[in-house]
Amino acid sequence: MADLEAVLADVSYLMAMEKSKATPAARASKKVVLPEPSIRSVMQRYLAERNEITFDKIFNQKIGFLLFKDFCLNEIGEAVPQVKFYEEIKEYEKLDNEEDRLHRSRQMYDAYIMRELLSSTHQFSKQAVEHVQSHLSKKQVTPTLFQPYIEEICESLRGDIFQKFMESEKFTRFCQWKNVELNIHLSMNDFSVHRIIGRGGFGEVYGCRKADTGKMYAMKCLDKKRVKMKQGETLALNERIMLSLVSTGDCPFIVCMTYAFHTPDKLCFILDLMNGGDMHYHLSQHGVFSEKEMRFYASEIILGLEHMHTCFVVYRDLKPANILLDEYGHVRISDLGLACDFSKKKPHASVGTHGYMAPEVLQKGTCYDSSADWFSLGCMLFKLLRGHSPFRQHKTKDKHEIDRMTLTVNVQLPDAFSPELRSLLEGLLQRDVSQRLGCYGGGARELKEHIFFKGIDWQYVYLRKYPPPLIPPRGEVNAADAFDIGSFDEEDTKGIKLLDCDQDLYKNFPLMISERWQQEVVETIYDAVNAETDKIEARKKAKNKQLCQEEDYAMGKDCIMHGYMLKLGNPFLTQWQRRYFYLFPNRLEWRGEGESRQNLLTMEQIMSVEETQIKDRKCILLRVKGGKQFVLQCESDPEFAQWLKELTCTFNEAQRLLRRAPKFLNKPRAAILEFSKPPLCHRNSSGL
């Protein structure tokens, strides 16, 4: 029966994988719904205050670029050539060999430069033209050939064209998407969890599918009780910090994180899914690798380490078991539990796996940085070639003996190793950091330029164009059977109680990596959600075309902000009523959907603006003269933050003006005014 359950778990998992690759959006069991266009009023202020609506910020986001491009192609004829040229350059930069780059660069020169020069319409500088002409004439077609044009294209788009985008419906759509992004609160309900694929000291790793996009991930779940029992809180929090550091920027050689969240019992990391097994497993199945095969893995691992070191992260646990293969055979470095940020202070702790730890790591109290990873790389490459660590002779398991050898023994390399390989390993395995390859000040560049990697095109490596020596079997899970992986004994943690102070440690644990979320959305549901939203908005416009539109009412007045909020209504204050609010310098107005009657509360009647909580939801409490109070709730985190801020600032400014105003202005007034028609509003209503 257990065997049957294992087979069914594997089949279910593999089917989910195949369907997610073919049509991930079709596999989505939850729908992403964009908020109404009126969200723009709040989101524009929210993003502007955080410096998030500059040209560079929007243009360099995946969703921002797509919307800006769409706007230019459909609305701004003069910008079409620049945008198309920009996209061509980006595609050119991805080309992996010189012949293709030469062919494409000549085509681009003819289409976007020469044609405009002949018609005297070329808008770019003489220096940019001469740069490309000079390099093309010498057939020097590096990936950065058109870089001067990238800079000038961006400069030409960031002025009036970007300002027009900011006034367009495409910017409104950008605000809608950003509202969704900034209001993500994940739980287990947002994932379909499949079979277990691994287990570590604190928890398990599962294959899972994200419910709203259909994308497959690995979910690493750490048991909070087990973490507490082993006093591993610092390690767990450190892993989340290290993953957040290395998961920004595009690095295809690290198992990166897209989300982190926690439940009352678990800490969850949502990571890149690797279906090809680990190098330790394949070493046992395949046997040792040849120099050529090892060179392939070394080159990809070097780029992974280079990315980490650029982020000032030292990995500290490089070994075959932590190198995972994807389904095509390319590798990524996984498990950053022991990684450390050395940007401000160098570590000195003795951590890692015996047989791979650098001498300076073993010497307690000695500070080190990325140097430790280059020594570990030498140990790991030796194992791929010989089947054991250079300091683990005769299969000894005595950790002290392994450490002693690491600190004292000069590694004897086999005669069968080529001179180039011997030079590489001797350089990496230097006990003296100052003499070690990668530690002269050039970092990964020193390894890339080593004779062992002669002929390697590192751009080709980065684009994963070299054929892997080993391709994991298709249609298999490439992980141990779920029953072989086993499970934790619940009795171990039976006496462990999680207290409020334990949970407080994880209050800042949730995280979402913006660029990775946007990439996930664009790959899966972006077009479908936009199309559906366009239909909904078109129907609403057709239905409400005779009614006074929200933005029309606010336009031309000194309305600070407007948008939907929920107001606690009815005589017993038990029902939430959705209303549209307008904040002016001297009043707050609101009305129900489709209503012409306008309610008004002046700043003079408000006694305080406070933050409160109702059923674990943050709310805004307005205390009004006469003992009344208004409770408002927002539909997203950014809306709550901005409404609370603007209401507080407006109230404080109104109170300041009231204190300076003549006393006759302080005569009692009705707390709430109702109008059958919208009140008259002058262009400047700051007078009280």
From Swiss-Prot:
The keyword Transferase applies. The keyword Coiled coil does not apply. Residues 1-190 are annotated as: N-terminal. It comes from the Eukaryota. Signal peptide: none annotated. Residues 54-175 form the RGS domain. Ubiquitinated. The active site is at residue 317. One of its GO terms (cellular component) is axon. Residues 191-453 form the Protein kinase domain. Its EC number is 2.7.11.15. Expressed in brain cortex, hippocampus, striatum, hypothalamus, cerebellum and brainstem (at protein level). It is found in: Postsynapse; Presynapse. It catalyses: [beta-adrenergic receptor] + ATP = [beta-adrenergic receptor]-phosphate + ADP + H(+). Residues 558-652 form the PH domain. GO terms for molecular function: ATP binding; beta-adrenergic receptor kinase activity; D1 dopamine receptor binding; G protein-coupled receptor binding; G protein-coupled receptor kinase activity; protein serine/threonine kinase activity. InterPro entries: AGC-kinase_C, GPCR_kinase, Kinase-like_dom_sf, PH-like_dom_sf, PH_domain, Prot_kinase_dom, Protein_kinase_ATP_BS, RGS. PANTHER family: BETA-ADRENERGIC RECEPTOR KINASE 2 (PTHR24355:SF17), G PROTEIN-COUPLED RECEPTOR KINASE/RIBOSOMAL PROTEIN S6 KINASE (PTHR24355). Belongs to the protein kinase superfamily. AGC Ser/Thr protein kinase family. GPRK subfamily. Specifically phosphorylates the agonist-occupied form of the beta-adrenergic and closely related receptors. Interacts with GIT1. This is G protein-coupled receptor kinase 3. The gene is Grk3.
